[in-house]
Amino acid sequence: MADFQEQLRQYRAQKRRKETVDNFKDKLRRFWMLGTGANKDTTIEVQQVPTKFEAISENSQDEAVTSSESELVPEEQPTRSTDHHHKENNCLKYTLWTVYLLFWITLYVIAIKLSFGLVFLMFSALFGIYFNTRTEPKKRNEMSAYSVFNKNCESIDGTLKAEQFEREIRYGSGSVR
């Protein structure tokens, strides 16, 4: 029983450490993006406000109520503040990427002056590939690039399958039709 408790304590400590590291990474990522990235944990709850018509029908179910149509239809409020915030966020994002691009061009010019232009360009390409490649596993029900273009996930003619590759290695290329 004590062994089980110890394993449970270790598991909880490991989860806390992982959560702390994930929080640190998230804060660091948001710091570098200067708050332009939306929080991944954002949840939006939609609550329906009862309309005047529903309130009237609940209060008097047996009575016939006569009222004008303007009382029954709720007034709609335009959501311009969210549109404005979205446009402002996009403007900040594009400005930030422009600053990043200008900074990269400046560093590239300095590298050219120091005769390291090609090296800088290669390292920039490697960093770009690394930071734009996802290393965590695919989320549940997430479309993969393969399934986007191949709806039924069938084998595409002309592609090398793992089974075919294994047969060719074991028995030679004549074993495959």
Swiss-Prot record:
KW Secreted (keyword) present: no
Lineage, uppermost ranks: Eukaryota, Metazoa, Ecdysozoa, Arthropoda, Hexapoda
One GO CC annotation: endoplasmic reticulum membrane
Function per UniProt: Ufmylation 'reader' component of a translocation-associated quality control pathway, a mechanism that takes place when a ribosome has stalled during translation, and which is required to degrade clogged substrates. Specifically recognizes and binds ufmylated ribosomes when a ribosome has stalled, promoting the transport of stalled nascent chain to lysosomes for degradation.
S-adenosyl-L-methionine among keywords: no
Name by which UniProt lists this protein: SAYSvFN domain-containing protein 1
Subcellular localization: Endoplasmic reticulum membrane
Family: Belongs to the SAYSD1 family.
PANTHER family: SAYSVFN DOMAIN-CONTAINING PROTEIN 1
Cytoplasmic side: 1-100, 122-177
Amino acid composition bias (Polar residues), ranges on this chain: 57-70
Keywords of the record: Endoplasmic reticulum, Membrane
Intramembrane feature spans: 101-121
Single Gene Ontology BP annotation: protein quality control for misfolded or incompletely synthesized proteins
Primary subcellular site in the record, as a coarse category: endoplasmic reticulum
Segments for region (Disordered): 57-85
Entry-linked InterPro entries: SAYSD1, SAYSvFN_dom
